[in-house]
């Protein structure tokens, strides 16, 4: 892809009151106890030994001190070193899938934890005890993360799991199973802004650089988990399958009650009105931000430094308009139209407030948006 014209207003998004934190916590001294190292590309896969991987969960704080902020490539996709490994991703690709498994799949910063909270409540019929007693990352482990990949066999049924994997790296067994995937999409402009903020406090991620630099990398897919465009275009091919639900952050933000009903229907777990209202109330942004089991405040600063910005920032739609410059908006729109042409429209395409200064109306809707193209796997 040719370089993007992002230099008209160089190096600034408008982030009121933002102060850039130090890039990374200093490395531990030589006297620190050595920590287990994930295998690197080219090393033979080691036997699945749960005892070997227990230290990752028991010593999160110590391990987080060794995060380098560097990435490795696995089949062309970037992953942060230390949180993921080639072996953990390979485990997911070849993992067994149970018919009652429930997967939440998203591109990063698309509302994953919101969906985890909702499903945690639905699976408990609206009872908030689980979300108030168990950390969110244990309720729905990340499949491809080192800790998640090796803990999946021990998860009780029905297993609730989360993933940012593009479709080509997802568990192959899923495509011949009755397991369910809920894919949550979000306006990529808001995703980019949220990911920029997150990259400032998440120690496993590279420093994002200037907003111009980060946006250029985002549009080229040179960020963790690769291209947003490739991610959503890959998974949207599942639309129309009985075990696949596509829903957007914007739909849920506009009408959470109806969205929860739709999710319950997809899961075959109808709720009474009282339980439904409990799900809606306890999964609100305000409730999640106040819940220590859901706001990631239990993580050490060396892993997620919320002294420089909250993990749960705003929970709104359209925040990109407070940050994008005119040049950035125009550059984004050009790439978006090129990448998304021919796909069905999304809620963010038809929002008049999201219209950019560019005169092109955006991607053309497909003749039949509800028709699912060919399956991604034989």
Tell me what each language-model feature is.
Residues 2-4, 11-15, 19, 23-247, ...:
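PAPS-dependent sulfotransferase catalytic domain
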Residues 113-125, 247-271, 279, 287, ...:
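PAPS/PAP-binding and catalytic site of the sulfotransferase fold
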Residues 266, 282, 338-342:
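Hydrophobic alpha-helical segments
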Residues 277-288, 325, 329:
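C-terminal anion-handling pockets and recognition modules
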């Amino acid at each position: 892809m040719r370089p993007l014209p992002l230099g008209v207003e160089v190096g600034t998004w408008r982030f009121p009151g933002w102060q850039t934190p130090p890039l990374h916590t200093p490395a531990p001294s030589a006297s620190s106890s050595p920590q287990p190292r994930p295998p690197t590309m080219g090393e033979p896969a080691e036997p699945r030994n749960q005892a070997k991987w227990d230290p990752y969960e028991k010593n999160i704080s110590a391990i987080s001190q060794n995060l380098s902020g560097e990435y490795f490539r696995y089949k062309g996709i970037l992953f942060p070193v230390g949180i993921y490994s080639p072996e953990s991703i390979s485990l997911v690709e070849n993992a067994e899938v149970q018919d009652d498994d429930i997967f939440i799949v998203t591109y990063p910063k698309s509302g994953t934890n919101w969906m985890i909270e909702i499903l945690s409540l639905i699976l408990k019929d609206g009872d908030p005890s689980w979300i108030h007693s168990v950390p969110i990352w244990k309720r729905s482990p990340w499949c491809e993360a080192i800790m998640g990949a090796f803990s999946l066999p021990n998860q009780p049924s029905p297993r609730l799991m989360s993933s940012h994997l593009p479709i080509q790296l997802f568990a192959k067994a899923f495509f011949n199973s009755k397991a369910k995937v809920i894919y949550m999409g979000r306006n990529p402009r808001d995703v980019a802004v949220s990911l920029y903020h997150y990259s400032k406090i998440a120690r496993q991620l590279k420093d994002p650089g200037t907003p111009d630099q980060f946006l250029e990398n985002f549009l080229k897919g040179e960020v963790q988990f690769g291209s947003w465009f490739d991610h959503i275009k890959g998974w949207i091919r599942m639309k129309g399958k009985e075990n696949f639900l596509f829903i957007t952050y914007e739909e849920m933000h506009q009408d959470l009650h109806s969205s929860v009903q739709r999710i319950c229907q997809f899961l075959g777990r109808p709720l009474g009105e009282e339980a439904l209202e409990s799900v809606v109330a306890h999964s609100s942004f305000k409730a999640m931000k106040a819940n220590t089991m859901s706001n990631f405040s239990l993580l050490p600063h060396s892993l997620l430094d919320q002294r420089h910005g909250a993990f749960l920032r705003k929970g709104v739609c359209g925040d990109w308009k407070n940050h994008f410059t005119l040049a950035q908006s125009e550059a984004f729109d050009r790439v978006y139209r090129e990448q998304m042409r021919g796909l069905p429209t999304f809620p963010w395409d038809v929002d008049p407030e999201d219209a950019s200064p560019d005169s092109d109306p955006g991607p053309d809707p497909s003749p039949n948006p509800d028709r699912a193209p060919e399956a991604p796997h034989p």
